[in-house]
C-alpha cells in the first residue's frame, strides 16, 4: 500500500512575491491518505506556533520517561492491556459523548491497565495534546501518544506533553523515515510502538531491526475493517524471526471480549490495545476488570 505525501502549502517565489500553486494529486484515495495530507498541514502550523527550540526547552525540564515496554513485560495479567482514551474515530464517529479523559484514565488505572494510549489527533479523532497533558497529570501509568506521526516535531510535542511512548505507523512512513524517527525517539527517551498490518510491512520492520515493540493492527487503515485473523496470520508467518529479535507483540483493534484476548494471546501477542470496547462501557473500570478477568 502506497500512501502519497504532498507539501501542505506548495508555493513558488517570483522576485519579492510568493504565489500559491495548485496541487496536482487530485483527491485522497482513501481515509488514511486523507488523514496524512491533513496531518502534514497541521504539522506546518504547529511548527510556526511552537518552534522546536521551545519544545526542546520544555523536554529538558522533564523527568525521565517511564518504561512503557517494561510495564507490558512485567504486567500481572496476560495479555497486558493498553487501554485507550478515545472520544471518536473516522469509522465510528463519536464513541463517547460524555468524554472526560481524566476520569476515564483514572478508571483505567484502577481497573488494571498496564499502560494507556491517548489519541492526540484532533481533526479525525477529537483528541489533542491537551488531552495527553491532562491524562499525564492524572495517572502514573506509562502513556502512548497515539497519532499519525510524520515528523520529529510531533515526537517532541508528544514528549513535552508527557508521553512515554509514541506510535509509528509503517504504512505511512518510508524505511528511512522509520529509522530516523526511531533515533529521534530514542534521544527523547520515548519507546516506539511500530505498527504493521500486513506481511510486507512486517517484513520491512524485521529487516530494519531495532524495533522491540511491534503492534499488529487488525484494522485495515484504508477501509477501517477489522479481522483478528491478521494477528494470527502474521505471528505464524514470521514466528521464527520475531522470536530471534525478541519482539514483544501488541494486537490492536477489533478486541471486544475475553475470548478475543485469548485468541490473540494464543498467537503470541503479549499485550492488547483496546479502545472502543471500553469507551462504550457505562462503567469503564468494571468493563476493564471484566475484560481482563481469566
UniProtKB/Swiss-Prot annotation:
The organism's place on the tree of life at top rank: Bacteria
Family of the protein in this entry: Belongs to the TrpC family.
Known pathway: Amino-acid biosynthesis; L-tryptophan biosynthesis; L-tryptophan from chorismate: step 4/5
Keyword NAD in annotation: no
HAMAP family, alphabetized: IGPS_B
Enzyme category, top tier: lyase
Species this chain originates from: Synechococcus sp. (strain WH7803)
Reaction catalysed by this enzyme: 1-(2-carboxyphenylamino)-1-deoxy-D-ribulose 5-phosphate + H(+) = (1S,2R)-1-C-(indol-3-yl)glycerol 3-phosphate + CO2 + H2O
This protein's name: Indole-3-glycerol phosphate synthase
E.C. designation(s): 4.1.1.48
GO biological process: L-tryptophan biosynthetic process
Encoding gene, per UniProt annotation: trpC
One term of GO molecular function: indole-3-glycerol-phosphate synthase activity
Keywords from the named record: Amino-acid biosynthesis, Aromatic amino acid biosynthesis, Decarboxylase, Lyase, Tryptophan biosynthesis
Annotated InterPro entries: Aldolase_TIM (IPR013785), Indole-3-glycerol_P_synth (IPR045186), Indole-3-glycerol_P_synth_dom (IPR013798), Indole-3-GlycerolPSynthase_CS (IPR001468), RibuloseP-bd_barrel (IPR011060)
PROSITE patterns for the chain: IGPS (PS00614)
Upper taxonomic lineage: Bacteria, Bacillati, Cyanobacteriota, Cyanophyceae, Synechococcales
Amino acid at each position: 500500500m502506497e500512501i502519497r505525501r504532498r507539501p501542505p502549502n506548495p508555493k513558488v517565489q517570483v522576485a519579492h512575491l510568493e504565489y500559491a500553486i495548485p496541487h496536482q494529486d487530485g483527491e485522497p484515495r482513501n481515509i488514511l491518505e486523507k488523514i496524512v495530507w491533513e496531518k502534514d498541514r497541521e504539522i506546518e502550523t504547529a511548527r510556526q506556533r511552537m518552534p522546536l527550540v521551545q519544545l526542546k526547552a520544555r523536554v529538558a525540564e522533564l523527568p525521565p520517561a517511564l518504561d512503557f515496554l517494561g510495564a507490558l513485560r512485567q504486567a500481572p495479567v496476560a495479555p497486558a492491556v493498553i487501554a485507550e482514551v478515545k472520544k471518536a474515530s473516522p469509522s465510528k464517529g463519536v464513541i463517547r459523548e460524555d468524554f472526560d479523559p481524566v476520569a476515564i484514565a483514572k478508571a483505567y488505572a484502577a481497573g488494571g491497565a498496564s499502560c494507556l494510549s491517548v489519541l492526540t489527533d484532533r481533526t479525525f479523532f477529537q483528541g489533542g495534546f491537551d488531552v495527553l497533558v491532562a491524562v499525564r497529570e492524572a495517572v502514573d501509568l506509562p502513556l502512548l501518544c497515539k497519532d499519525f506521526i510524520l515528523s520529529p516535531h510531533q515526537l517532541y510535542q508528544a514528549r513535552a506533553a508527557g508521553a512515554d511512548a509514541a506510535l509509528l505507523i509503517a504504512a505511512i512512513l518510508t524505511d528511512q523515515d522509520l529509522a530516523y524517527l526511531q533515533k529521534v525517539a530514542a534521544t527523547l527517551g520515548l519507546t516506539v510502538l511500530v505498527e504493521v498490518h500486513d506481511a510486507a510491512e512486517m517484513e520491512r520492520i524485521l529487516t530494519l531491526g531495532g524495533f522491540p515493540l511491534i503492534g499488529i493492527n487488525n484494522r485495515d487503515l484504508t477501509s477501517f475493517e477489522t479481522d483478528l485473523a491478521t494477528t494470527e496470520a502474521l505471528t505464524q508467518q514470521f514466528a521464527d524471526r520475531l522470536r530471534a529479535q525478541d519482539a514483544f507483540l501488541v494486537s490492536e483493534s477489533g478486541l471486544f471480549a475475553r475470548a478475543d484476548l485469548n485468541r490473540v494471546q494464543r498467537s503470541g501477542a503479549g499485550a492488547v490495545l483496546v479502545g472502543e470496547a471500553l469507551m462504550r462501557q457505562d462503567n469503564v473500570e468494571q468493563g476493564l476488570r471484566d475484560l481482563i478477568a481469566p
